Amino acid sequence: MSRTTLVEAPEEVTAAAPVVPRRQRSTRRWRRVVSPVVLVLGWELAARTGLLAAEKLPAPSDVLATGARLSRDGTLGIHLLDSLTRAGAGLLIGGLLALVLGTVAGLLRLGDDLVDPPVQMARMLPHLGLVPLLIIWVGIGESLKISLVALGAFFPIYFNTYAGIRDIDERLVEAARTCGLGLAARLRHVVLPGALPSLFLGLRLAIGAAWLSLVVGEQVNAQTGIGFLMMEAREFSQTDVVVLGLLVYALLGLISDLALRVLERRMLTWRRGLRAT
């Protein structure tokens, strides 16, 4: 009679994502607010005590009062809408073109040979230095502003799309091909997820470059926009309006970056990076 020994199978161990306590998250949020609040309070105190001349740098409270006044009469809203429209159009045009060319250069050897060399040469030129040439090509109207934003957004998205595709492990693509996945399925299930982290980085850099380009573009023969509002205020020495315009640009950049971070976290739930300690 044979004797059978039963051996228990080891329990499956799954790695759980680290859970950050709610109290720790709340403390971190407060820490991120401390330095801006201290900076604004110091600015206000320096302006009120006369360390900063009002005509050079007005107090934050005066800038906020000016912003409230321009918001009530609709001036700020009109200029803000025009700036957002230009930024959105430029980002869409430059981003789509960069995405297509970056994908072609990253996936195809022929595309790499034909597309990448001229793009590499063009990126050595400061796009803001092309303003005189762009004026000759597209005039000094809306096309100039949108073209500057599109150029500013193009290069970060192109290079990060290209690098994201090239950094994908070729063995994953071969495994997908072995499993019978067609080209479209490989692009969807292997290439796109692998390139997304790099693509999001390119988008964040592109947004910053787009706002910088818009600042310059709206100071060239513009009739509306935050940049035009600042230039008009400069002529009348309205420093509070100039500072308000700078704060609006800064807030637009911050809000767009935060929105992109939220979208990135939701789309890349599978990706676990290093947490700051």
Feature map (PLM): residue ranges:
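Transmembrane alpha-helices
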Residues: S147, L151, L183-G217, D240, ...
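Transmembrane alpha-helical segments of polytopic membrane transport and secretion proteins
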Residues: M1-V37, L258-T277
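Short cytoplasmic-facing helical segments at TM-TM junctions of multi-pass membrane proteins
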Residues: P117, N160, G164-L205, M230
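Transmembrane-helix boundary motif in ABC transporter permease subunits
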Residues: A89-V119
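Pore-lining and gate-forming transmembrane alpha-helices of multi-pass membrane transport proteins
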Residues: R86, E232-G253
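Generic hydrophobic transmembrane alpha-helix motif, especially the helices
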Residues: Q120-P156, A163-G164
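C-terminal transmembrane helix and the adjacent membrane-cytosol boundary/short C-terminal tail
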Residues: R109, R166, P197, L201, ...
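Periplasmic/extracellular loop-to-transmembrane helix junction in inner-membrane transport proteins
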Residues: P18-S26, T49-I93
